From Swiss-Prot:
Name recorded for this polypeptide: DNA mismatch repair protein MutL
Keyword DNA repair: yes
Pfam families xrefs: DNA_mis_repair, HATPase_c_3, MutL_C
Native source species: Chlorobium phaeobacteroides (strain DSM 266 / SMG 266 / 2430)
GO molecular function, one term: ATP binding
Domain of life per record: Bacteria
PANTHER family per record: DNA MISMATCH REPAIR PROTEIN MLH, PMS, MUTL (PTHR10073), DNA MISMATCH REPAIR PROTEIN MLH1 (PTHR10073:SF12)
Length: 624
């Protein structure tokens, strides 16, 4: 007698439900994707008890005939594909034909539907996958699916559901991710008889503001690039809007929400030193790609896609994000509050409105800030600035498809032409010849204060110089054009065993940077030449400190070798707080700073520039 037997359909469906239906949010995601595939222009989501008691999805899509409705709850019955070749051109969100039978097998399930042109609709009800009732009913065009008492017949699964607050959070994230991806659809959500939101217009900005706080969308940076292979569009958040989790990163491929480690890492790396450790940037990004170049059938919940050529996708994705970030001014406002995340308790009870309280400051370009500085400090004196693109007008919509573009991934202009040297200390009362410009000052030999067109700008001289040196070091190493000054008297440095190992690891890049070094004995190094930016007499201390910091960064931050070395070099070699600068040196530092690609933060993520507007000053003095 055969020991292997085919499982009954109701048992197979319950097993399948273990992968497809993990929690109420899984039910909602699958049903919403079906509604979108049915060309719905209006969708209403209703839940009770965080989806444990009730989940109901109402859409005005194409509806189904009686025959199609009955087939829809059969395993592997679908209208999305008919052959294996269809998987290569898949544009629908659903395609397996597993969701409805899996959901029906673990709930009290009801489907009511009516196609266009039919006089009556069809209603079908089943409990635990077993048919209970079917009838003709009056109905509007579209489909209504009601799921009650999820996992009522699988107590072990129901027991593992989390608290209502947790389950509601997952539900809301599922609905939000689709409402943002399909702004052309009217969305409404009701929880425990209270309306949470109702989006009647296709305004993506209205939705972002509703989800994250008033005027949130004003502080976002639009992204729009495309070529024959890939399109990228959407929005990026300012570094001040960072979160300590990646819940607020939405990446879509052909409008399908996905989780992709490669893209998430590329996004994180594109922000680079703008991010504080363990923080993640806000992102709402839509990637369009030929469906034949991806495989969406690699995850039970269809949350992952496999790219045919992942390297090419990253090669295009990373520079677009990097360039977009580099072209904007992220300097913090002096009166900005600390950005907040989701309000405490907001998701604990669905009767409260949801949202973030990020401070919405309209994004401006680096060239705008530099122009304000030049006009504030020098009036209408003409100035030259490396070519940065001005901020584009706020788009009326976002492209989520396959619009063509010619990518322009150029970097910013030359870094700088002047080398800063701290001058010898002078008494504070000693007048500086030529220091007659009243619009640039040094405060406590630590900060530079400048008048700008809109108010004032405060620059930390140490981290500003650090940013200049960092970008110069990266470029010099990558271009392999060392700029070294030879020492009249070579200096000898004794290294410990671990220091010498680090030295050997970075020796080639030290040469690229401008250090001319020669081994002299077991653990001794002769310094015969140094970079132009290193002050003679400091080379031994700087090299030793660089080796120490390089090792610390390697163990803590896992940085790429040249980035790590550039950080160490710039930090140890920058002018320090307490060093007096002449007016010309301050001007040179400011000009060099604004010629860098990212002038708003130092390589470690600390702010370089803080702005204080006239409006803020007026409010402080009670003028407004």
């Amino acid at each position: 007698m055969a020991k292997i037997a085919r499982l009954p359909d109701n048992v197979a469906n319950k097993i399948s439900a273990g992968e497809v239906v993990q929690r109420p949010a899984s039910v909602i995601k699958e049903l919403l994707e079906n509604a979108i595939d049915a060309c719905a222009s209006k969708i209403t989501v209703t839940i009770k008890d965080a989806g444990k008691e009730l989940v109901q999805i109402v859409d005005n899509g194409i509806g189904m005939s009686r025959q199609d409705a009955l087939l829809s709850v059969e395993r592997f019955a679908t209208s999305k594909i008919s052959g294996v070749e269809d998987l290569d051109s898949l544009m629908s969100l659903g395609f397996r034909g597993e969701a409805l039978p899996s959901i029906a097998s673990v709930s009290q399930f009801e489907l009511k539907t009516k196609p266009e042109g039919a006089l009556l609709g069809f209603r079908f009800r089943c409990d635990g996958g077993e048919p209970v009732e079917e009838s003709e009913v009056n109905a509007e065009k579209g489909t209504t699916i009601t799921v009650r008492n999820l996992f009522y017949n699988v107590p072990a699964r129901r027991k593992f559901l989390k608290s209502n607050a947790t389950e509601f959070r997952h539900i809301f994230e599922s609905v939000k991710s689709l409402a943002l991806a399909y702004p052309e659809i009217e969305w409404k959500m009701v929880s425990d008889d209270e309306e949470l939101f109702h989006f009647r217009t296709p305004d993506i900005y209205e939705r972002l503001d509703a989800f994250y706080g008033e005027n949130f969308s004003l502080s976002l940076i639009p992204v729009s690039e495309e070529n024959d292979y890939l399109s990228i569009s959407g929005f990026l958040g300012k570094p001040g809007m960072q979160k300590r989790q990646k819940l607020d990163q939405y990446i879509y491929v052909n409008r399908r929400i996905i989780q992709n480690r490669m893209l998430s890492q590329a996004l994180q790396q594109a922000y680079g030193e703008l991010l504080v450790e363990r923080q993640a940037p806000f992102a709402l990004l839509f990637l369009g790609i030929d469906p034949s170049r991806i495989d969406v059938n690699v995850h039970p919940a269809k949350l992952e896609v496999k790219f045919e050529d992942e390297r090419s996708v990253r090669t295009m994705f990373y520079p677009v994000i990097k360039r977009t970030i580099q072209l904007h001014d992220f300097s913090p406002d002096a009166a900005e509050k600390e950005p907040c995340s989701i309000k405490e308790g907001t998701l604990d009870c669905s009767s409260r409105k949801l949202g973030f309280q990020d401070i919405a400051e309209p994004a401006s370009t680096t060239s705008t800030l530099y122009a304000n500085y030049r006009q504030g400090a020098f009036g209408d004196t003409p100035f030259e600035r490396p070519a940065y693109a001005e901020k584009e007008p706020r788009p009326s919509s976002i492209n989520t498809g396959f619009e063509r573009f010619e990518p322009d991934l150029r970097e910013g202009g030359d870094l700088f032409s002047t080398t800063l040297q701290a001058r010898p200390y002078e008494d504070d009362n000693t007048p500086d010849p030529g220091e007659n410009d009243p619009k640039i000052w040094q405060l406590h030999n630590k900060y530079i204060i400048c008048q700008i067109k809109t108010g004032m700008m405060i620059i930390d001289q140490h981290v500003a110089h650090e940013r200049v040196l960092y970008e110069r070091a990266v470029d010099v190493m990558n271009q392999n054009v060392p700029n070294s000054q030879q020492l009249l008297f070579p200096q000898k440095i004794e290294l410990r065993a671990w220091e010498y190992e680090v030295f050997e690891e970075i020796r080639d890049d030290l040469y690229r940077l401008g250090f001319n070094l020669r081994s002299f004995g077991a653990k001794t190094v002769m310094i015969e030449g140094i970079p132009q930016d290193v002050r003679p007499g400091t080379e031994v201390t700087i090299l030793q400190d660089m080796i120490t910091e390089f090792q610390e960064n390697s163990s803590k931050l896992k940085l790429e070798r040249r980035e790590n070395l550039a950080r160490s070099y710039s930090c140890r070699n920058a002018i320090m707080a307490g060093q007096k600068l002449s007016l010309e040196e301050m001007r040179s530092l400011i000009d060099n700073l604004f010629a860098t690609r990212v002038p708003y933060t130092c390589p470690h993520g600390r702010p370089v520039i803080i702005k204080l507007s006239l409006d803020q000053l007026d409010r402080m003095f009670g003028r407004k």
